[in-house]
């Protein structure tokens, strides 16, 4: 799938999401943030890997918080409460989910 052929979804609060590619087992998603934009704490049954493409993020998984920059990554186990704040933007995360997030296609 070509990047510009996928839908850009405005998530509000200074962030957008673009589903890049997927099948039943795997999904890649680009999430862009303005400085101060937040991915509020949440959980889901999917395992997630977040890779920082650009910007700096304060990323929390359960009770552990780390500041991540370009080239850094974090794995979020299914069911873990996690969230992030872009502390230096614009920032972009590449999120990989297994299995795919069907809710992102609705």
Name the predicted role of every residue range.
Residues 64-78:
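Short acidic-glycine-tyrosine-enriched beta hairpin
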């Amino acid at each position: 799938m070509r990047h510009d052929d996928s839908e850009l979804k405005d998530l509000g609060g200074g962030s957008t999401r673009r589903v890049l590619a997927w099948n039943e087992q795997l999904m890649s998603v680009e999430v862009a943030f303005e400085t101060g934009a937040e991915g509020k704490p949440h959980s889901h049954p999917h395992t997630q890997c977040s890779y920082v493409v650009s910007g700096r993020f304060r990323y929390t998984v359960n009770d552990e918080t780390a500041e991540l920059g370009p080239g850094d990554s974090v794995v979020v186990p299914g069911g873990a409460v996690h969230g992030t704040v872009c502390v230096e933007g614009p920032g972009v995360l590449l999120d990989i989910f297994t299995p795919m997030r069907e809710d992102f296609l609705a």
